[in-house]
């Protein structure tokens, strides 16, 4: 994701299914994209962002479940989880993930002080994001090898508007669509690699991201300790 600027849409969040009003046919024909929003739904924090370039629909379902379908074009990311995040959390996820092209399924979040966007990538489409990052080695977590990396975004959108910030990556080489992520293993590995992991957490979600691709995902998340 290039970043997220929060949009408070509490009334939409309460309904669970976020979409344009039925009477707004012109806008539906133009974008057919769920409006950007974030907030609480059925005990979980969700975030949904799109640059408007793709035909995309995000829907909050019961509990920790969400659904996304998207078409070619643009950048989008959404999912459910918690706010605030934690360095050490056991996150179980499972469901359906069917990308066509460049896409990630990841534990995803932000910290402030420093401002950092981080990804623990469990599955991806045609592009391994660690291949474009500064190589920080590997770590074994949750039964697989993850490639560690760092990138820097300059004057890019973020949770605090346009900023320059680092992105931390931990990318699983044995892809999976279900399992449990021990986030502490990854934060510890980043710290050993010299990265600052002492920031103040904002949200921490299991997100599906698409970048000029298409696909479908229906994911359920839970905190299991």
UniProtKB/Swiss-Prot annotation:
GO terms for biological process: xylan catabolic process. Keywords: Carbohydrate metabolism, Disulfide bond, Glycosidase, Hydrolase, Polysaccharide degradation, Pyrrolidone carboxylic acid, Signal, Xylan degradation. Gene3D superfamilies: 2.60.120.180. Disulfide bonds join 141-185. GO terms for molecular function: endo-1,4-beta-xylanase activity. It catalyses: Endohydrolysis of (1->4)-beta-D-xylosidic linkages in xylans. The modification Pyrrolidone carboxylic acid is found at residue 32. Induction: By xylan. SUPFAM superfamilies: Concanavalin A-like lectins/glucanases. Optimum temperature is 60 degrees Celsius. Thermostable. Belongs to the glycosyl hydrolase 11 (cellulase G) family. PANTHER family: ENDO-1,4-BETA-XYLANASE, ENDO-1,4-BETA-XYLANASE A-RELATED. This is Endo-1,4-beta-xylanase. It comes from Thermomyces lanuginosus.
């Amino acid at each position: 994701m290039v970043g997220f600027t929060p949009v408070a849409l509490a009334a939409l969040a309460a309904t669970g299914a976020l979409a344009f009003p039925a009477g707004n046919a012109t806008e539906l024909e133009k974008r057919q994209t769920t409006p950007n929003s974030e907030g609480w739904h059925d005990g979980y924090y969700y975030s949904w962002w799109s640059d408007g370039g793709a035909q995309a629909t995000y829907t909050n379902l019961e509990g920790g479940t969400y659904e996304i379908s998207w078409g070619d074009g643009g950048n989008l990311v959404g999912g459910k989880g918690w706010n605030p995040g934690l360095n050490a959390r056991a996150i179980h996820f499972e469901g359906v993930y069917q990308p066509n092209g460049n896409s990630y399924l990841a534990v995803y979040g932000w910290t402030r002080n420093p401002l950092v966007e981080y990804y623990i990538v469990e599955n991806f489409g045609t592009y391994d994001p660690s291949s474009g990052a500064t190589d920080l080695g590997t770590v074994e977590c949750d039964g697989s090898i993850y490639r560690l990396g760092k990138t820097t975004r300059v004057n890019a959108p973020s949770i605090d508007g346009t900023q320059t910030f680092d992105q931390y990556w931990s990318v699983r080489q044995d892809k999976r669509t279900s399992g449990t992520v021990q986030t502490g293993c990854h934060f510890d590995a980043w710290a050993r690699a010299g990265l600052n992991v002492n920031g103040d957490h904002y949200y921490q979600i299991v997100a599906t991201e698409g970048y000029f691709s298409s696909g479908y995902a229906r994911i359920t998340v839970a905190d299991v300790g």
